[in-house]
Design a protein with these regions (language model features):
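Segments of small-molecule ligand-sensing domains
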Residues: 332-345, 354-413
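Extracytoplasmic ligand/sensor domains, especially the bilobed periplasmic-binding protein
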Residues: 111, 124-227, 280-304
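Immediate post-signal peptide segment of exported/extracytoplasmic ligand-binding proteins
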Residues: 36-57, 91-98, 188-194
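Extracellular/periplasmic periplasmic-binding protein-like sensory domains
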Residues: 270-349, 417
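Beta-alpha junction/loop-to-helix N-cap segments that form part of ligand/metal-binding clefts
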Residues: 33-43, 67-74, 89-163, 172, ...
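Short, low-complexity disordered leader/linker segments with a strong preference
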Residues: 1-54, 420-422
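Signal peptide-proximal N-terminal region
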Residues: 53, 75-100, 218-222
Length: 422
């Protein structure tokens, strides 16, 4: 997709990426229907009527992050496309509404993300599902000032889950510190000594992963960080950093990287250098088919990541009732016939399911009532979650999902890693 002004709308009939994509130029902006109330006279917020609710998304739909970005729209589009086809979603105020999605491409550019938010804020009820830390940060303060929900977004930046700092926000995926910490705990439990080299993105994303990892290995006599470097999110190559890290003698490479092409080229470059450590990769840049296979990850003794959701690429995924329904709905309502290579499709689908839970508790068609209902979800097992994971929005400082499982690449997909030495 080549434009950042692309809109995707979920209707009560077939809708999806590539099927319904309307250029969002000069669209009239309006609030909720004047006669949409809670029955007791409370005026509706923008983006909701007695018949429908509209959600906004700004996310990368083109550029190097388009793969996972497109998934952030596809999953929720599929989920609500199916619900709309069944007649809509029942809300706590007694109304049944269809759910529409307006999605704009920000190309992973913070300025474009802010412009997209400004374009959407008056016509959508809430913003959701968008990918990226710098892009979501670009309009966080504006959303607070405008009192527009920015919720269940795909960033592990803890600021979005701090109620005092971000009263109109809530992240969906585990914070970066939780992911880095989970791997650190696994490594610290090893019976062997390890030298670690770190490469991280020079922003809150990279810093969060490193912070969690270092906290987990603090006091572990068997772990030594021997070299630590950073890169910029705008860099097109990290060959220089990899060459320097390869000379460190590290047997473990902690790579907190968010850019898909850079991860692939890093896997390839380290092999060219003859440096074959075990790797850690974040959950959003560890896809077996889209990243590990083209990068030649099977050459390394181990590639580890973390997860809270089932992988659509797993051999047994389509055999389960939820997995089969997901794939069918992705094809029918999101124009996504292939098995998703990125986990963001499943995450976005789970966001849709979580929002349906929240809608069912809304007693007024207002953003304030929505936020109150959102912060009261506990113990909800969304479709396609791994055993032991659940949605809990009641913990201040934590996103909707805070538990992760460390996994190890087996050449085709991932299997749980109970210990480093197994």
């Amino acid at each position: 997709m080549s434009t950042n002004r692309r809109r995707m709308r979920v209707a009560s009939v077939v809708a999806g990426i590539g099927i319904v994509a309307v250029l969002a130029a000069g669209c009239a902006r309006g609030g909720g229907s004047p006669d949409a109330t809670d029955g007791g006279g409370a005026p509706a917020s923008p983006g909701i009527t007695d018949e429908s609710i509209t959600l906004g998304i700004t996310t990368p739909l083109s550029g190097p992050t388009a793969g996972p970005g497109t998934c952030t729209v596809a999953g929720i589009t599929a989920y609500f496309g199916a619900r709309n086809a069944e007649g809509g979603v029942e809300f706590g105020d007694g109304q049944t509404r269809t759910v529409e999605i307006d999605a704009l491409d920000d190309e992973y550019d913070p300025q474009k993300a802010k412009a997209n938010y400004d374009q959407l804020k008056s016509s959508v009820f809430a913003m959701t599902a968008g990918l990226g830390t710098p892009t979501n940060r670009a309009w966080r303060e504006a959303a607070i000032a405008d009192e527009v929900p920015q919720v269940l977004i795909m960033t592990g930046d803890p600021i979005f889950s701090d109620t005092a700092e971000s009263p109109w926000q809530l992240g969906f995926v585990p914070i970066y510190q939780n992911e880095g910490g989970a791997f650190g705990e696994l490594l610290a439990g090893s019976a062997e000594d390890h030298k670690v080299a770190i490469l991280s993105q020079n922003d809150d994303y990279g810093e969060g992963y490193v912070e969690g990892f270092k906290a987990a290995i603090e006091g572990a006599d068997n772990i030594e960080v021997v070299k630590e470097l950073t890169y910029e999110a705008t860099d097109t190559s990290v060959d220089a950093q990899l060459t320097e890290l390869a000379g460190s003698g590290a047997d473990v490479f902690f790579n907190a990287m968010s850019i898909t092409p850079l991860v692939i080229s890093s896997l390839q470059k380290t092999q060219e250098l003859g440096w074959l450590p075990s790797w850690f990769l974040p959950s959003n840049t560890s896809s077996p088919s889209a990243i590990l296979e083209p990068g030649g990850a099977a050459a390394f003794p181990g590639v580890y990541t973390v997860a809270f959701a089932q992988s659509a690429a797993a051999p047994t995924f389509a055999e389960s009732e939820d997995g089969a329904a997901f794939l069918e709905q992705m094809a029918e309502y999101a124009n996504y016939p292939d098995v998703p290579a990125f986990p963001h499709c499943v995450w976005s689908y789970q966001i849709g399911a979580t929002l349906e839970q929240v809608f069912g508790e809304m007693t007024e068609p207002t953003r304030e009532n929505f936020m109150a209902a959102l912060r009261d979800v506990s113990g909800y097992t969304a479709p396609l979650m791994l055993e032991g994971s659940a949605v809990d929005t009641t913990q201040d400082g934590q996103p909707a999902v805070s538990t992760v499982q460390v996994q190890k690449y087996n050449g085709k997909g991932y299997a749980p890693a109970e210990s480093w030495d197994e």
